[in-house]
Structure formats: C-alpha cells, structure tokens
C-alpha cells in the first residue's frame, strides 16, 4: 500500500499531514510532480518523482504506477476519476473523498462549469485554502489511510 500525491499543486499543509502519517506508520509515500519537490530529510519512506514536463505527465505516472488499495491525493478531477476506476482511495486537499458513487457527478459538474467559463460566464473560483480545509483533509485522510492499511493487511494474509 502506497500513498501517491499529485504534488504540483498540493498545499504545503497537505504534504505536512501526509509526511507525519507516513513517518508514524512507515508507509511509502511518493510525490509526483513536473519539478523537484522538497522531501523531509528524515522521511525515509517518502520520495519524490520528477516527470518530464508536459500536460498530464504526473497524472499518467500515478495512473500507471498506482495499484488498487493505494491512497491518492489530488485536486485534479479527471485524474481522480481514473484512479477511482482503478480501485484507489482518492481524496482532494480539502478533505473530499472521491468514490465510485460520487466521481461521475463531480466530473459532470466540473465539465458543466468549464462549459460556462468557455461561454464567458464568470463562475468564481475556490476559496483560499485555510485551517478548516486542513482539518477536513486530516480527518478524511486519517480515515481513508486506516481503511487502506487494513485492506492491505487483510489481502496479505
């Protein structure tokens, strides 16, 4: 079981929560980005993978290497959809879990909003990332990580 982070746009707070959990639970964690990403020196289970520049290269790497039961962190809905379809647990930096039951409607809404923006309609943006988001992320991340670890332990018996 591994943790995958789509690191190009992951907030620092999210990475800190994941780094602490990875160290505490000895879980392999891989940050994937188009540019080097800092990894704590004492985090022996955390590593960074730099993919070549280009649209969706980090996404392709995570989809190719992630396995069912792994946990992924991404704000990229199309990537989340691919990972959910592959059997990964997926969470966004604000603590929203994506599942087979929710991903289709989230992708549909995203596409609708893209169409509105393409037609010149101002749709606004996301609120700035704040303490409530970090707390929601930490709570959902802990729950999903526990679930993923239990699933990995059960399948290895």
Swiss-Prot record:
InterPro entries on file: UPF0178
Pfam families attached to this UniProt entry: DUF188 (PF02639)
Family annotation (NCBIfam families): PRK00124.1
Protein family (similarity comment): Belongs to the UPF0178 family.
UniProt-recorded name of the protein: UPF0178 protein RB974
Organism: Rhodopirellula baltica (strain DSM 10527 / NCIMB 13988 / SH1)
Higher taxonomy: Bacteria, Pseudomonadati, Planctomycetota, Planctomycetia, Pirellulales
């Amino acid at each position: 079981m591994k943790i995958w982070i789509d690191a190009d746009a992951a907030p620092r707070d999210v990475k800190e929560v994941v780094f602490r959990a990875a160290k505490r639970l000895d879980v392999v964690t891989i940050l994937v980005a188009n540019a080097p990403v800092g990894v704590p020196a004492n985090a022996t289970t955390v590593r960074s993978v730099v993919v070549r520049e280009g649209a969706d290269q980090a996404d392709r790497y995570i989809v190719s290497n992630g396995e069912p039961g792994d946990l992924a962190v991404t704000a990229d809905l199309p990537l989340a959809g691919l990972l959910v379809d592959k059997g990964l647990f997926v969470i966004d930096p604000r603590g929203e879990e994506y599942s087979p039951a929710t991903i289709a409607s989230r992708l549909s809404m995203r596409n609708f909003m893209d169409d509105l923006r393409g037609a010149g309609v101002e749709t606004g943006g996301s609120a700035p990332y704040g303490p409530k988001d970090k707390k929601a992320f930490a709570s959902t991340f802990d729950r999903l990580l526990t679930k993923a670890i239990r699933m990995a332990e059960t399948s290895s018996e």
